[in-house]
Amino acid sequence: MLSPSENTALLVMDVQPAALDRISDKDAYLTRVRATVEAARRKAVPIRFVVVGFRPGMPEVSPRNQVFGAYRKQASTMLVDPRPAITPEDGDVVVTKRRVSAFTGSDLEVVLRGGDVQHLVLCGIATSGVVLSTVREAADKDYRLTVLSDLCADPDPEVHRVLLEKVFVRQAAVIASEQWVQSLG
């Protein structure tokens, strides 16, 4: 059996200014995410920031896309600057995606396979968006999965609860970030 940090990567997904504006108590959320990222770095767990981003004018987005199409209509610059809210450090990798799942429209899988990653530890905004889509796709790709319950956030508290308590547990270990950090030793 793998140790908690062996062949593991921490995916910090869509923790960007535009996404943070959609959740309550974003300062406390960011504090928890930063603490977990720092603990992972101390234990040499690779950090992979996944951000959503597009070229100016958003040519990657079809007018039929219900998630991102509204931003395109508004000629939004919000998603054209895909900086994570937590500053990456040397050794961290920032992956830009162009759809909801962290895998779709990105080179995430190439980056993970290049590092022989077999276990993904997931957190991000929104639970009903990037976290749900990534859990499903990663499970189909046979990754071992852990979802950090207190580092997932969603504008809809009931959807968040149902996903964590009833949906994700079918394909992932769902634990608090503190428990995962303690498991690193």
Model-assigned labels for residue ranges:
Residues 17-21:
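Short acidic, Gly/Ser-rich segments with clustered Asp/Glu that frequently serve as metal-coordination loops
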Residues 26-34:
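Short amphipathic alpha-helical segment that frequently serves as the phosphate-/nucleotide-binding helix
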Residues 1-7, 35-43, 68-185:
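Active-site-adjacent betaalpha module
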Residues 9-16:
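Acidic-leg catalytic submotif of subtilisin-like serine proteases
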Residues 40-59:
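Von Willebrand factor
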Residues 59-71:
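Aromatic- and acidic-residue-enriched segments that line the glycan-binding/catalytic groove
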Residues 22-26, 159:
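Short, solvent-exposed loop/turn segments at secondary-structure boundaries
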Residues 15, 49-52, 149:
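A cross-domain feature marking catalytic cores of carbohydrate-active enzymes
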